[in-house]
Structures are given as structure tokens and as C-alpha cells.
Amino acid sequence: MTHSNRMLLGVNIDHVATLRQARGTRYPDPVKAALDAEEAGADGITVHLREDRRHIQERDVVLLKDVLQTRMNFEMGVTEEMMAFAEKIRPAHICLVPETRQELTTEGGLDVAGQEARIKAAVERLSRTGAEVSLFIDADERQIEASRRVGAPAIELHTGRYADAQTPTEVAEELKRIVDGVAFGVAQGLIVNAGHGLHYHNVEAVAAIKGINELNIGHALVAHALFVGFKAAVAEMKALIVAASR
């Protein structure tokens, strides 16, 4: 991937598949959503093939790999099954995320510092496919340093605590944590992305942070698309990010 000065938007289409799986139908099609997102200005498409297959299915990933004009960011747990699948699909980008069956979504970042040997082996193996491997972590210096040590070229900072913050003081504290994490990551020579819980009313403060390469956003886009359409939802988010990151 070429890393430009402008901030990129990665559109996560998982929850289009969530709606489909709720009834076991063939619609709505996440592949169509991905193509619409690209037309509306998405710089990449993110999908998370979960162990429990609650939304995205293998077939979606295979189809997307064939039709995307931008690039795929493939989110996956650190399991043998997923690593073998990623080796077969060979996405441009792979993001390793923590995963349990009970979670509603990816809660908290990957504990890289607590399992360095395991993560290092996964990063090395997946990097051999030609993918740029990133690690979904909290904006914590210990985890950022560990990410560099295991050889990951990129990290994605977890913005969920910022998104969930209730009071102005909490919001400011969590935003500062992200700002500091971005600066520390860049200083470590890492490509720094961010995402989780971002929506139309909280994205601008994060998009204004210098040093972030890409924001990954999904649930808010899919929710807004119910009322304005998918292309309009993506275009609106892209405009907010472009304006805030100038």
C-alpha cells in the first residue's frame, strides 16, 4: 500500500452480512456493499471472518478478493484455521484481532506483550504471503513496543474507549491516549491506523490527529445507510474525514 499524507477510509462491511445472516438469506450482499463503498470513495474494504461465522462467510472473502478495485483488509483471530485461509486468499492487508465466541465485537486490543512468541510467529508466517500485517491493540506504549518487536509493520489503535466515554473529561482523556499512542507508534517506525466505535459525531477529533494513516469504520456506516443509502453514507463519512484531517 502507498501511504499518503491524506487520511484513508477503510469501510468495514461486516454488519451488512450480519443483516443477511439474521434470516439466512442471500441478501443484503456484502460484496455489493463493498463495490458501492469503493464508488463512494472508500480506500479499502475491511472484513472480519470470525471463528463463529456470525456475519462474513468464507465465500464473501473469496468473492471480494476477486472483485475489489481498492484492497482488502482481512481481520482474523490468531488461529491455525485462519492463518491457513489467509495463506490461500492472500489479502493485501491482514489485521490480527483478539476473538472470543462470547464477545459482541472485538472488545479491547490484542495482548501482544503477553504472547510475543505466538504473535511473532503469526506475523512472520502471514508476512510471507506478501500481506502488510497489522495488530489491533490498545493505545498503550507497552503494546506498541511489543508490536514493533514482533515485526508487524503496522498497528490499528483501538478507539472504543474514546467512543464509549461519557463525560467531556473522559472523552478528552481517551482522545489524549490516542494522540499519544499515534505519536509513539510513528516514532517507533510503525504505520498507525485506528478504529472501533467511530461514528459521524465523534470521528472528526480522531481524524484531526496527525500521523494516522487510515480509519476503519463499519457499524455506523451500515446503520446510517439504512436511511440514506450505502453510497451516501460512505461519501458523508469520507467528507468528514477529509475535512478534519486537512
UniProtKB/Swiss-Prot annotation:
Residues at the site labelled Transition state stabilizer: 156
Compartments (UniProt record): Cytoplasm
A Pfam cross-reference name: PdxJ
Record field: catalytic activity: 3-amino-2-oxopropyl phosphate + 1-deoxy-D-xylulose 5-phosphate = pyridoxine 5'-phosphate + phosphate + 2 H2O + H(+)
Superkingdom in the source lineage: Bacteria
Annotated GO MF terms: pyridoxine 5'-phosphate synthase activity
A single GO cellular-component term on record: cytosol
InterPro entries the UniProt entry points to: Aldolase_TIM, PyrdxlP_synth_PdxJ, Pyridoxine-5'_phos_synth
Binding site for 3-amino-2-oxopropyl phosphate: 12, 23, 197, 218-219
E.C. code: 2.6.99.2
Active site as annotated: 48 (proton acceptor), 75 (proton acceptor), 196 (proton donor)
Positions contributing to 1-deoxy-D-xylulose 5-phosphate binding: 14-15, 50, 55, 105
GO biological process: pyridoxine biosynthetic process
SUPFAM superfamilies, sorted: Pyridoxine 5'-phosphate synthase
Record keywords: Cytoplasm, Pyridoxine biosynthesis, Transferase
CDD domains: PNPsynthase
Pathway entry: Cofactor biosynthesis; pyridoxine 5'-phosphate biosynthesis; pyridoxine 5'-phosphate from D-erythrose 4-phosphate: step 5/5
Quaternary data: Homooctamer; tetramer of dimers.
Record-stated family: Belongs to the PNP synthase family.
Summary of the function given for this chain in its UniProt record: Catalyzes the complicated ring closure reaction between the two acyclic compounds 1-deoxy-D-xylulose-5-phosphate (DXP) and 3-amino-2-oxopropyl phosphate (1-amino-acetone-3-phosphate or AAP) to form pyridoxine 5'-phosphate (PNP) and inorganic phosphate.
Protein name, entry field: Pyridoxine 5'-phosphate synthase
